[in-house]
A protein has these predicted regions:
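N-terminal non-catalytic structural scaffold regions of very large proteins
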Residues: 2-312
């Protein structure tokens, strides 16, 4: 006979329970394990990488944002426990990001073995480069809106979960920095390009690498550029909606107002190319309002892997 448990749930030692945030990270680690499983079809593995990335974005926008609010609003032991939980989350996410990068490299190698090539701008043949430059001029350049970083001008509100390029330019007047959104919602993240003359299969290049290949054209007539490099980054904002209680607005009007305010909500995570120069990273960190102890996560060259789900 099973004895009933005496006492209330509130009386149990909280150390017996795993915080729901860490439990959720364990679940997403399981998704990443599926992406690493070589018995799973390679296209499905790629989609698991996309699911992992999308899940992590939502985790920061909702769960981590909630913990940050708790740290801000609470005091004493409750605040300290929230700070310790946030530190644990940051450590686990950094580990997961490293594992993600390793798994992604293996999946890309397997795609190549099956004659599906995703190349970058450094691997383009002369014929492919000509195609990419023409594609850029017709479809990509009109959709780009570069923003110069200047101490005199405030940076406009950037869209969370969008992919951006941070640009480091060497000019005769000194270093110049800019950011621009990668317009994958307009053009698509994967661009199909011609194969090599003797190659088989399909060849794609990421839209961000199309922009990298043609970077000097973006600023032609603005700067005399000696060299330029671009580094991916993205960030997540607090997803909480604050609904005003005014009786003079309809629910739809209240929701619309709340969604507009969310565009200016606190940023809760910043993921960036680990090779980004320190000066450029510091500029972005300050302008996006991140402290040094916040969730700044170095990663690989490419981000927004949830778009892998839509690989043609």
């Amino acid at each position: 006979m099973i004895n009933p448990i005496d006492g209330r749930l509130a009386d149990l030692d909280e150390r017996l329970f795993m915080p729901r945030e860490l439990s959720w990270l364990s679940f997403n680690a399981r998704v990443l394990q599926e992406a690493a499983n070589e018995s799973v079809p390679v296209i499905q593995r790629l989609r698991y990488l996309g699911i992992f990335s999308s899940n992590l974005d939502e985790f920061f926008r909702v769960r981590v944002a909630e913990i940050r609010r708790l740290i801000t609003l609470s005091t004493g032991g409750k605040r300290q426990r929230a700070k310790e939980l946030l530190e644990t989350i940051q450590e686990q996410v950094a580990h997961l990001q490293q594992e993600f990068d390793r798994t992604q490299s293996k999946v890309m190698a397997e795609l190549k073995r099956r004659h599906i090539y995703i190349i970058d701008e450094t691997e383009l043949s002369r014929r492919q480069l000509t195609y990419v430059e023409d594609y850029f001029a017709k479809h990509v350049l009109p959709a780009l809106e570069p923003i110069l970083l200047s101490d005199e001008l405030a940076i406009p509100a950037l869209a969370d979960e969008s992919l951006y390029l941070a640009v480091d330019m060497k000019t005769p007047e000194g270093d110049k920095y800019a950011v621009m959104e990668v317009p994958s919602d307009v053009v698509g993240r994967f661009v199909s390009i011609p194969r090599g003359r003797d190659a088989q299969g399909k060849v794609f290049i990421l839209l961000d690498d199309v922009i990298r290949a043609c970077l000097p054209r973006v600023f032609r007539g603005v700067f005399s550029i000696e060299s330029a490099s671009a580094y991916c980054f993205k960030f997540s904002r607090d997803a909480e909606l604050e609904i005003e209680t005014s009786i003079n607005e309809s629910l739809i009007e209240k929701m619309a107002s709340s969604l507009k305010q969310r565009r200016k909500a606190d940023a809760v995570r910043f993921v960036y190319d680990a090779t980004m120069p320190e000066m450029l990273l510091e500029q972005l960190r300050k302008r996006l309002g991140f402290g040094r102890s916040d969730s700044l996560i170095p990663g690989g060259r490419d981000h927004n892997s949830q778009e892998c789900i839509g690989l043609p």
